Amino acid sequence: MTTTTSLKHDIANPALAAEGKKRIEWAERNMPVLAQIRERFERNKPFNGVRIAACMHVTTETANLMRVLKAGGAEIALCASNPLSTQDDTAAALVYEYGISVFARNGVDRDGYYAHINAALDIKPNQVFDDGCDLVNILHTTRKELLPNVVAGCEETTTGVIRLRQMAKDGALTFPMVAVNDTDTKHM
């Protein structure tokens, strides 16, 4: 484990990184399709130069998705969509073992939650991944200066999709979003 990093991050405990890495690798062994995609992305680098801000559950499954995007050339900043589901060891491993900026601590309060979203947005994203539409909402309310950089995003939850559809109906949504919850692959 690397004990120092120049990456911007806010995690609970760097000493948890080794345990987090073990759990991420275990999850990876049960995600063979994602592993194949990562191999292809390592060769083709489809996300070279792309900055992604992701607001998702910080779990071993999400960690493997972030690793795939990084293998594809993306620069990533991940924050927690739900502080109560944050796995602190996973967050530590993403920072110290895999070089991904993470802003997440299990049990963080409301102010910390929104500070983490803003910290992830400081990457000046081209794409966003959201779970509940809080990141996209902040982009469209208090971080509007970043909107010209964002070309697209995806939303994982039904609640987030409802919020996005209302934003689109009101003419407030400034970039296209994929409703992951509506895709056939989510319901296989």
Placement of each model-derived feature along the sequence:
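Glycine/serine-rich phosphate-binding loop and adjoining beta1-alpha1 elements at the start
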Residues: T2-F47, L78-M188
